[in-house]
Regions:
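Hydrophobic positions on the alpha1 helix immediately C-terminal to the Walker A/P-loop
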Residues: 12
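Conserved lysine of the Walker
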Residues: 9
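A structural motif corresponding to the C-terminal end of an alpha-helix
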Residues: 163-168
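Hydrophobic anchor at the beta1->P-loop junction of P-loop NTPases
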Residues: 1
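A glycine- and Lys/Arg-enriched "phosphate-lid" helix/loop adjacent to the NTP-binding pocket
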Residues: 97-160
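ATP-dependent small-molecule kinase phosphotransfer cores
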Residues: 25-116
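The conserved Walker
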Residues: 5
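Hydrophobic alpha-helical packing residues
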Residues: 16, 20-21
Length: 168
């Protein structure tokens, strides 16, 4: 599932998992950034808790590479083992999110290049909602704001998702 912050991907992923379970189909929801060591590091970078030595935020290319590294580790440590056991995997965000989010800063070509080796999903669902609705949902959550969760980026982000899906 792909979509901007506040689009409802997490809610939809759980609804899909529940529906599959009701039909006797084994499925697990997972998310990116992952809860693994690289994903944890990445969340600290996105929240501004880890910065460059001079206090400035980590650059866009490094962030894109961290997302790709987290995704690669997530595939190897969790997604592939689940799939080999016959479990359906519902991923709350995958590489199209990098095309949209990191593509805004470093360009779609770079974001696509660092994600080129990733396993291709069988199905991609894009949850597209109005920017104001997404902002309202996001603002109602009691979570720390991350780098890409600023209002000025949200309409550009929605268009970036649309562009990523047209081109890929």
């Amino acid at each position: 599932l792909e979509g901007a912050d506040g689009a409802g991907t997490t809610t939809q992923a759980e609804l899909i998992r529940s529906s599959l379970a009701a039909g006797g189909i084994d499925a697990q929801v997972t998310a990116q950034p992952s809860k693994g060591p690289i994903g944890t590091l990445l969340r600290s970078v996105l929240r501004g808790k880890i910065t460059r030595d001079d206090g400035r935020r980590i650059g866009g290319r490094a962030i894109a590479a961290l997302f790709a590294a987290d995704r690669s580790e997530h595939i190897e440590s969790l997604i592939e083992p689940l799939l080999s056991e016959g479990v359906h995997v519902i991923c709350d965000r995958y590489y199209h999110s990098s095309f949209a989010y990191q593509g805004l800063e470093v360009g779609l070509d770079y974001a696509a290049a660092v994600n080129a080796p990733m396993k291709t999903p069988d199905l991609i669902l894009f949850v597209d909602v109005d920017v104001d609705v997404a902002l309202q949902r996001r603002d109602s959550r009691a979570t720390e704001q991350e780098l890409y969760e600023v209002e000025a980026i949200q309409s550009r982000l929605r268009e970036a998702y649309h562009t990523a899906f047209r081109l890929r």
